[in-house]
Regions:
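An exposed, glycine/acidic-rich loop-and-rim segment of catalytic or binding clefts
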Residues: 2-357
Length: 357
């Protein structure tokens, strides 16, 4: 049975309380979540040498605000929406109507304001439930949304995230979590190994929007199918990696198992700590971001240490970016009265439990 601990983490200028909720299981895995942005602040994985915190974050609420309200927000650990990733030219059409959004990433719209929301929290059993609403017109999107995020910690060292969103008007939705992982517990992630179960990826343009071409990974630095160190092909002069700051910021099309409710999409491991992580999801894509601009974060990381380039990698399970501009992509439309559901599971292993990547 999971155990819960709640403690104060800060207060908004309006006097609203920011709390930290720590969930732990009998095996020693523990997760810290904030009611601000549904942020995953810490994941402590038990090892023979003691627990290792494998995610990036900040020590104070003020630092999260400083980060998230900057033009180069990292969205560190946050639940992202209304539309995770980009909407090209910050415009889309749904239900026969055209909507203009805030252009917050050049001329495009990126992620939205869910990371800066406060959520009501309930705890029961092994579950942390966070709920909020998004009013019609927020960021320019139509529809009043009811939002539900569940974090479920299991006894076999897995953290499952369930999303449930309903709308009273036709709209679009794309949700993810923007946690940065570092399975070494510090330093850069270039030597950590990663396998992505994807034979294809979305080609990007110089604004990190899909061109519409879905290309094979074979024979390119985008090929993670056999597993390799994250940094092995990161600096080869390949145009797709150079145009995003010398790294990866690309959506991979997951090779889905036939009839599977969740598919294994990624497997990462650290030789230093012996920690491995497998990622399963119901979503069609996973965005790999290797922290190419983390060094620009205006707020310090944990322990006051500045964020560094390649200091973490994100595996953002999601629908494809800019889907409203590409009718050939899986639809992100959410019709009035319908419910969007998706879930992702992170499963952690140590030593030889997981096999060798």
């Amino acid at each position: 049975m999971a155990q819960f601990l709640s403690k104060p983490f800060g207060m908004t200028p309006n006097g609203e309380k920011i709390n930290e909720y720590i969930i732990s299981n009998p095996g020693g895995l523990a997760v810290s979540v904030l009611n601000y942005g549904c942020i995953i602040k810490n994941i402590w994985v038990p090892t023979k040498r003691g627990p290792v915190d494998v995610v990036l974050g900040h020590d104070t609420y003020a630092d999260y605000v400083k980060d998230f309200e900057s033009s180069g927000s990292t969205c560190c650990g946050a639940f992202v929406g209304r539309y995770a990733n980009r909407i090209e030219n910050a415009v889309f059409n749904v239900g026969g109507k055209t909507y203009q959004l805030e252009a917050n990433n050049g001329k495009n719209h990126l992620h939205g304001t869910f990371p800066r929301k406060l959520y009501e929290v309930k705890t029961f059993g092994d579950t942390l439930l966070l709920e909020a609403e998004s009013p019609d017109g927020e960021d320019g999107f139509p529809g009043n949304l009811k939002i539900s995020v569940r974090y479920i910690l299991t006894e076999d060292n897995a953290l499952r995230t369930d999303y449930r969103v309903s709308s009273d008007a036709d709209t679009i939705i794309n949700l993810t979590n923007h946690t940065y992982f570092n399975l070494d517990g510090g330093g850069d992630v270039l030597g950590q190994k990663l396998r992505i179960y994807a034979s294809r990826y979305l080609e990007g343009n110089n604004e990190t929007c899909p061109t519409g071409n879905i290309l094979p990974v074979a024979g390119t630095p985008m090929d993670f199918r056999a597993g390799k160190p994250i940094g092995r092909d990161i600096d080869t002069g390949f145009s797709q990696t150079t145009m995003v700051g010398g790294g990866y910021d690309h959506c991979f099309v997951i090779d889905r198992g036939r009839g599977a409710s969740q598919s294994l999409c990624a497997w990462a491991s650290s030789d230093k700590t012996g920690i491995s992580m497998k990622v399963y999801t119901t979503q069609p894509g996973v965005q790999l971001y290797t922290g190419n601009f983390l060094q620009d974060c205006p707020a310090p990381g944990k322990g006051g240490v500045p964020m560094q380039k390649y200091g973490g990698f994100a595996l953002e399970t999601q629908h494809f970016p800019c889907s409203p501009s590409h009718p050939e992509f899986p639809s992100t439309a959410l019709r009035a009265g319908k419910v969007f559901r998706a879930n992702t599971t992170l499963r952690f292993f140590t030593g030889k439990q997981c096999g060798k990547l």
